[in-house]
Design a protein with these regions (language model features):
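Glycine-rich anion-binding loops of enzyme active sites
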Residues: 54-56, 61-63, 91-177, 290, ...
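Helix N-cap motif at beta-to-alpha junctions
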Residues: 265-272
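Short, compositionally biased
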Residues: 176-192
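Acidic, Ser/Thr/Pro-rich beta/coil linker or hinge segments at domain junctions
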Residues: 2-3, 13, 29, 281-324
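Small-aliphatic-rich amphipathic alpha-helix that forms the alpha element of a beta-alpha
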Residues: 69-96, 109-120, 196-202, 220-226
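N-terminal glycine-rich phosphate/pyrophosphate-binding loops that anchor nucleotide-derived ligands
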Residues: 1-87, 123, 151, 159-164, ...
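Active-site-proximal betaalpha loop/short-helix elements
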Residues: 17, 102, 191-259
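Beta-strand->loop->alpha-helix junctions that form or flank phosphate-binding loops
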Residues: 36-39, 131, 215, 233-244, ...
Length: 324
């Protein structure tokens, strides 16, 4: 595939385009509060709580996934929330959910998926709300986490000259129900998953990264774009350096939600230690690019370089840190 064709495919990817609704909505909710350290644009809001911070996040499941496989949707709703907290260098504490279903059968399938994920990750659902008789099926989960204030990882603090590192668990499969979901976590034990999740906490506590984010359903490049928007920085990404399963094409992989995947920025002197930390928990981590001052995301492939996003004209979410 030619680079120009790949760029066109990524720009038109629905997982990226649907993020553009965020910024106009957020403008209605901006206000000052002395206890809020960071909010919109981060994977979780950060609330001052003495020597610690509370982390608060929420995710709703894409209706396409709910229609394709309600049980997998329930599982993923837990998975994505836990990763939002982990990406901040935090520890997940508990979740609440809002479930709307059109039938008892759908309710059973979704709740079965939630139960499997709760058992797998050890983070409880402690309350919520259910609509048992709606004309639609929807699931939203909110999560509370915590972190030490001095070990917090934000996505809005990347710096010029930082290396860009991608860490992902390649031991998995494309989920049979949804072509844009990579499933590694159901193939791992609870102990293995706990160690993988704790990597981000270790990185935060040792101040090894300057910024970080979990890779979302906007895919790897969409997620990098969001990190660059919030940091008001640019990047150059070498597409041939991106770790991926051999059996999956690059164009497909770049649109996949990887399940256990994080994008990080770090100083050169910390890169080797970061790679080793992920390798110890059976994750693949590679340097795939670097941060630049010029506010655009450039991609390199087979000796050619092109601009994927030029900010702010191009936009993923339109958010800059806790501002928009």
């Amino acid at each position: 595939m030619e680079l120009s064709e790949l760029i066109s495919e990524i720009r038109s990817f629905e997982g990226i385009k649907r993020k553009r609704f965020i910024s106009p909505l957020v403008k209605r909710f901006l206000f000052d509060n002395s206890r809020v350290i960071a909010s919109f644009g981060e994977d979780a809001a950060v609330i001052d709580f003495g020597e610690e911070v509370l982390l608060l996040a929420a995710d709703g499941i894409w209706d396409k996934l709910m229609k394709a496989d309600p049980e997998w949707a329930g599982y993923c709703a837990v998975l994505v929330n836990i990763h939002d907290i982990a990406a901040m260098g935090g520890e997940p504490v508990a979740m609440v959910d809002v479930l709307s279903v059109s039938s008892a059968e759908k309710c059973l399938r979704v709740s079965r998926g939630i139960q499997k994920a709760v058992e797998k990750f050890g983070v409880p659902v402690v309350g919520g709300h259910v609509h048992p008789d709606t004309s639609y099926d929807a699931l939203d989960i909110a999560i509370l986490g915590k972190a030490k204030k001095n070990s917090l990882i934000l996505s809005s603090t990347a710096e010029k000259g930082d290396l860009l590192i991608y860490a992902v668990d390649l031991h998995g499969r494309i989920h049979p129900s949804f072509p844009f979901n990579w499933d590694s976590t159901t193939l791992r034990s609870s102990d293995e998953l706990k160690k993988q999740i704790e990597c981000m906490k270790i990185l935060g506590e040792n101040r090894l990264v300057t910024a970080g984010k979990d890779v979302s359903n906007s895919g790897l490049l969409g997620t990098i774009g969001m990190l660059l928007e919030t940091s008001v920085k640019g990047a150059v990404v070498n597409l041939e350096s991106i770790p991926k399963p051999e059996e999956i094409s690059l164009s497909h992989w770049l649109k996949v939600y990887p399940g256990m995947g994080f994008i990080l920025t770090a100083k050169d002197e910390n890169a080797d230690e970061i790679l080793k930390i992920f390798q110890r928990v059976k994750m693949r981590a590679e340097v795939i690019g670097f941060i630049q001052e010029e506010w655009k995301l450039e991609v390199e492939f087979k000796g050619e370089k092109r601009v994927l996003f030029s900010f702010p004209e191009d936009s993923v979410t339109g958010l800059r840190g806790s501002r928009c």
